[in-house]
Amino acid sequence: MEPSIYSFSLYTALPLMLFFGFYFLFAKTPEKKIFKNYLRSRQIMGIAMLLLSANYSVHFFFGIRFKNADSSILMNMSTYFLCYSLFSSALIMLLDRFYITKRRVWTHIILWIIFSTLSGVVVFLVPSGIIQKISLFALAVWLVVFGVVLARRVIVAYRRAIRIFNETQADDIGAYIEWLSIFTYWALIFGVGCGLLTFLPDEYVFIWILSSIPFYSYLFYSYQNYLLFYEQVENAFEQDIQSEEELLTNSETEHDIVSEKEVLSPIQNL
């Protein structure tokens, strides 16, 4: 691969990545409490975009892929693993404000540390040869499986959201957020594929980099549009939560009444 083509692809993608990342991180939202969760989701997505931008920057300014291929593989795999967690968390938060917990955050951090450490051991300590190739393949499989599991969580969350909107007769909103499902399947194909694309022959790497431009552009466009309907979406979720709480309360009340009748019945017979 000619460095000029590779550099041009990075030169094209990097400014957009930086713009999207900083915009997601610092752009304002309507000053309403209901938008707090949307803002957190967008900021997490912004952090993920800036991490990817940092990855692209190292490739662009230092040409690490040409100087040390092993370090390039390690950096890419470690970055993608962390970004998978950030992407999935940001998207699910749009439809489940309770998704992020301390336990889940620490679990993802620990998994990332373990994955990055093992990747470093395989790349730098395991001798080149069949054992190293098998180990790298195993790590790539782990990365892909991790991405698929997270993508499945996103899809399940969105299907639940569509069900809620269908039950509340909010078809217009339900149809509108179907972009989330579309984006999720796109992310599954493109994002999870990064685990395999890390091992692409050099002459095809620029195609992978350029293909990221429409992917992240669609993400930016979708977040901007989703902001228009976010308040209605949150209100629909609030109604669903209240309905579930009412059903739970009614169920507990009926259970208590039945229990009282069972207790009083023998006494009345006396």
What are these regions (language model features)?
Residues 2-13, 119-156, 197-207:
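Extracellular-loop-to-transmembrane junctions of the mid-late helices
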Residues 27-30, 57-68, 119-131, 191-201:
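Juxtamembrane "helix-exit" motif on the non-cytosolic side of transmembrane helices
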Residues 182-238:
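Interfacial "cap-and-anchor" motif at the non-cytosolic start of specific transmembrane alpha-helices
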